[in-house]
Amino acid sequence: MLEALFRDSVEEAINDSIKEGVVLAVYNTARDDQWLKSWFKGDDVSLDTLAEHSIWLRLVKDTEQFQLFEQVFPNVVVPSIYLIRAGKIELIIQGEDDRHWEKLLACIGIKDKKAGESSSRETNPGLAREEKSSRDVHRKNARERIAETTLEIQRREQLKQRKLAEEERERIIRLVRADRAERKALDETHHRTLDDDKPLDVHDYIKDAQKLHSSKCVLQIRMTDGKTLKHEFNSSETLNDVRKWVDVNRTDGDCPYSFHRGIPRVTFKDSDELKTLETLELTPRSALLLKPLETQNSGLSVTGMEGPSLLGRLYKGFSTWWHNDKDPEVTSQREETSKPNRHEVRSSTPLSGAASSSCFQYNNVREPVQSSAHASPMLTPSGTRYPSETNLTTSRSVSPNVFQFVNNDHQEDPEDPTTFNGNNVHLEKKKDEDKK
């Protein structure tokens, strides 16, 4: 019943209130109409009469419209009715009071008009009929306005839905067109690839063929000690000419080597050294490495055969004192053996089982080195009984001069030989003689 009294549009209610000059009744509620129904007497005055003399608006708490109203009129009490005329508050109805209905009618102006109507009816019955017909017209007009407002709201909602549907349809059409264009472009690209029989041009940007035929060749050569040499050669010169220049200017010794290139990784052979630098694709500039050659004699070497070591000299003095009277031949043999020899050592034939190690024979086997490309001969083991004998000098690098002595006396008694293996001294025989 009360729902037909309230307007739906806030703007429309405010505009009609200002235009007609009537009171704007703003009903503030918290979604519960019990307070209004407790004192509202709809039987005394019809809703059409209230709608004719005032415009009613309903605001629910915590809504956007209620918050806007609270900004204009702060400290709004819920539930309450604000009666506003020309932008000013004339009356606020709130709380529990039996006179709310009379105050409302008095502020709206219906009370005075009702009294005048009662007196006119008594004096003039025809006027009463006219007023009744006019009230019917106003009641009809109020219903029509409510119906028109409802239809307007429905029409706006339909237009909004229609607009959204049209926008969605346009979006789908754009997506379909974009998909068709993409498919068409892919098909054209595929057919163009299949129909194109022209071979693709392959460009090699790694090296320029014209620069490979330059007349000069700059080589940067890294020696075995990490230092570098840089020189400019003619492209017609061979790699052997480069070797000769390196042999003259190198500072890392005279070890044999071969040329090695990092990119592309190539180790040049002896046959490649007869080719020109242009043929080997070293022009216009390249970097070479000196790679030391590994020979079969590089595993065994004798270092510093300049003189007897400290242990050798001590043993020489001790053995001279020991065998001075009994064994002069052994002493002379040891003195001959301890003489310095600067030549490479080759192992002799194995001795008998009584000897703890083999003896070495010194031979002059050095040959002159003609070029750095050939490895010089080095010490090679031969005829050794034990594998550890080949590493004799490397295992004792602290004492560079290692000699082995063999006593020839008392060969008829192999159980107790008098030998020196470079590590310890056998003194058992000397002790036995002292006891005697």
Swiss-Prot record:
Keywords: Endoplasmic reticulum, Isopeptide bond, Phosphoprotein, Ubl conjugation, Ubl conjugation pathway. The keyword Transit peptide does not apply. Residues 325-346, 426-436 have a biased composition (Basic and acidic residues). The modification Phosphoserine is found at residue 388. It comes from the Eukaryota. Residues 347-357 have a biased composition (Low complexity). InterPro entries: Ubiquitin-like_domsf (IPR029071), UBX_dom (IPR001012). PANTHER family: UBX DOMAIN-CONTAINING PROTEIN 4 (PTHR46424:SF1). Interacts with CDC48. This is UBX domain-containing protein 7. It comes from Saccharomyces cerevisiae (strain ATCC 204508 / S288c) (Baker's yeast). The lineage of its organism: Eukaryota, Fungi, Dikarya, Ascomycota, Saccharomycotina.
